[in-house]
């Protein structure tokens, strides 16, 4: 499933929050991480998160399999 939200945070902050949330709280492994994106895997699924500049805010795209509830919770945090 693909999700999208906008935030006033910068990409670095979003990636830190994503690592704390998906790796720290839920135990997903960080499979890859760049400045603008990260892939977390575990529990039979994955979460891919990407930051995209969009006018005055930052667009955050999240693609997931098996972690929809957690992705929705994360979107409320950013």
List each model region and its residues.
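Ser/Thr- and Asn-enriched, surface-exposed coil loops between beta-strands
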Residues: 31-37, 56
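Generic recognition of cysteine residues
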Residues: 11, 36-37, 51
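Beta-strand/loop substructures that line and gate deep hydrophobic ligand-binding cavities in soluble
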Residues: 41-78
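Terminal, regulation- and interaction-focused segments at domain boundaries
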Residues: 1-30
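Short, solvent-exposed secondary-structure boundary motifs
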Residues: 19-21, 36-44
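Positively charged, low-complexity terminal tracts
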Residues: 3, 29-33, 42-43, 65-66
């Amino acid at each position: 499933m693909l999700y999208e939200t906008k935030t006033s945070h910068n990409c670095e902050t979003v990636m830190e929050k994503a690592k704390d949330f998906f790796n720290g709280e839920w135990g997903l492994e960080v499979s890859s991480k760049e400045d603008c994106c990260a892939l977390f895997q575990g529990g039979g699924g994955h979460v891919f998160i990407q930051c995209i500049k969009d006018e005055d805010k930052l667009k955050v795209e999240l693609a997931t399999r098996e972690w929809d509830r957690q992705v929705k919770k994360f979107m409320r945090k950013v």
